[in-house]
Amino acid sequence: FNKDTYYVGFDANQGAEVQGQMVKDYIEKNIDKIDRNGDGVIGYVLAIGDIGHNDSIARTRGVRKALGTGVEKDGEINSAPTGTNTDGKAAEVQDAELEVNGKKYVVRELASQEMKNSAGATWDAATAGNAIGTWSSSFGDSIDVVVSNNDGMGMSMFNAWSKDNKVPTFGYDANSDAVAAIAEGYGGTVSQHADVQAYLTLRVLRNALDGVDVDTGIGTADEAGNVLSEDVYKYSEEERSYYALNAAVTADNY
């Protein structure tokens, strides 16, 4: 990059952590009813968007890290799909232990797969809808939570099965239909703060055109007093990048 080049986007790794923590918080808050068959195992299934996509990899790792089911491979949490994992012996994940109110539960990733259709398209909502049908036939009431790398796949699974069976489903992107579905039992989603990304983009451009410091109106107030709060963005000087921070959208704040 030259000295006048900057990047604006969202923090994928921070967003992945937000999604994982959102799922864990929901489980802990609803521990008295989350275990549908009472077997002491909190089972979840995971819809993976694209096994080679950075955002998909980050989100899979974020969920597994938060729930304790991740295993390391080459210094990072393994993000590969497990296929089915009925007995908890899949190499890609591990059973985790979660203690809430003095009681211990096993957390298990029952199944995960890349949602790729026959034409090769990834992040495919229809494939996710079919997958939840297969998983529900295989696992039944062992599925306590449904997690997806995005809302497109998440809503497909929610509408196909989770909603009628009252199983919390979590996605990512804060799509309007997903946010609206929270009132119907959708567990939650993650906002990438598109408004902050848009403001950052326009502000960096405006500052460049005006010949003022790039941080004007972002980290330092402009003449009109415009400035962003530190909880909605971060700046990486090494990467010359502005990142909007992600936020959980749940029944508590939607």
Task: Name these PLM-found stretches.
Residues 1-254:
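A residue-level marker of the well-folded mature domains of exported/periplasmic proteins
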